A protein has these predicted regions:
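Short, low-complexity disordered leader/linker segments with a strong preference
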Residues: 1-36, 49, 75
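N-terminal lobe/hinge region of extracytoplasmic solute-binding protein
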Residues: 39-86, 119, 184
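Ligand-site clamp/hinge motif
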Residues: 205-250
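Aromatic- and charge-enriched surface segment that lines or borders ligand/interaction sites
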Residues: 82-127, 145
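Alpha-helical secondary-structure segments
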Residues: 110-117, 142-145, 187-188, 214-216, ...
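Surface-exposed binding/hinge segments that line
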Residues: 85, 89, 96, 129-171
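Gly/Pro-rich hinge or "lid" segments in bacterial periplasmic/extracellular proteins
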Residues: 71, 75, 160-212, 216, ...
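Structural transition elements
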Residues: 307-341
Length: 342
């Protein structure tokens, strides 16, 4: 592919549309190289957003968008909604829907369309009610009002989950198979074809937020990190997502590749048994004190991880760097605890 360096995307943040990020790279593309091939993990079995966690794939493919999205500090920022406010009763939220947005079929995004989409989600997904419960949703022009059964101070944030992506429900009523063909959304891409092994997308010419970077995107499912790395090296794909720490060094010093690193929201942790001798809390504490997390992060994970000190990662703005870690690496403490227990 001329004019485009190979790209390696390591990690993925919540709410990030992969294809939107890739599109920013397309400064020099032409009609002869307007197809992007992305090696990725198999995201979904179908494109039905309410099934399992498949809505994440729809958003990652650049097909669906939500009312809000998150910035680098995980704060809610406008997306399909331009603003929102909470009523004095603490139960009523009013969202102003972006007047410039169209669905990929050309239909205008209205508050009524958002209402219908959210109601469909709640009707088809039991998981939706684990976020919040509403008593009434009303629409008036571009104003959407949601009344909830109790106070949800962070309702806009909850609506940023991919489960609540907004789709044109009239397409389904007119015979579209959402699971196979994907929803009609507001994102920069539209599904051309989809199987568990491969997704093909085309540019949404009705996209409201600028022209998408590539006319077509092909996403073969390559679940093994090493195989994804090999596909990138061989030129079978132009970009690979979530390359493992073991393959990271292959590309690190190669000028033919561009590495995009993003702070993840995920933790890697080990569950400790509390049975048998490990019922003793001092023995468990000794094992924890003997765990050199800094060394694991540096040597096993090739500096692509940071040593954990809390369940929440430092990418979430909860004062991670100010935490006092009572379980930090301390060999002498481990020895003392073991000695105490004989």
């Amino acid at each position: 592919m001329k004019g485009l360096r190979k790209a390696l995307l390591i990690g993925m943040t919540l709410g990030m549309t992969v294809l939107g990020t890739v599109g920013c790279m397309n400064q020099d593309s032409s009609s002869s190289n307007d197809v992007l091939k992305v090696g990725a993990i198999n995201f979904a079995g179908t494109l039905e957003p309410t099934e399992n966690y498949f809505s994440w794939a729809v958003v990652r493919f650049g097909v669906g968008e939500t009312l809000i999205k998150f910035d680098d500090q995980m704060k809610a920022t406008p997306w399909l909604a331009t603003s929102w406010k909470q009523g004095d009763d603490k139960l009523t939220w009013t969202f102003t829907i972006n007047d410039k947005v169209k669905f990929s079929n050309g239909n205008k995004l209205t508050a009524e369309a958002v209402k219908a989409s959210l109601e469909r989600t709640f009707a088809k997904s039991k998981r939706a009610k684990t976020f919040f419960n509403y008593t009434e949703i009303t629409a008036n022009g571009q104003e959407l009002t949601i009344k909830t059964d109790k106070e949800y101070y962070n309702l806009p944030n909850l609506l940023g989950d991919p489960l609540f992506l907004i789709m044109d429900v009239t397409a389904e009523a007119n015979g579209r198979d959402i699971a196979k063909e994907g929803p009609i959304g507001t994102g920069p891409y539209v599904v051309s074809s989809f199987t568990k092994e491969r997704a093909e997308l085309k540019r949404n010419d009705n996209y409201w937020d600028g022209k998408a970077g590539f006319a077509k995107v092909e996403i073969p499912s390559i679940n093994d990190a090493n195989t994804r790395a090999m596909a990138l090296q061989s030129g079978d794909v132009d970009m690979a997502i979530s390359i493992g720490p073991g393959e990271y060094s292959i590309f690190q010093n190669d000028k033919n590749f561009t590495i995009y690193e993003m702070a993840s929201l995920r933790d890697v942790f080990v569950r400790m048994s509390q049975k048998g001798k490990l019922q003793n809390p001092n023995l468990r504490a000794a094992l924890i004190a003997a765990a050199d997390r800094e060394s694991y992060a540096k040597n096993l994970m090739k500096d692509t991880f940071v040593a954990g000190a809390a369940p929440l990662p430092p990418s979430i703005d909860y004062g991670f760097n100010q935490l006092r870690d009572p379980n930090k690496y301390n060999v002498e403490r481990a020895k003392e605890l073991l000695k105490r227990e004989g």
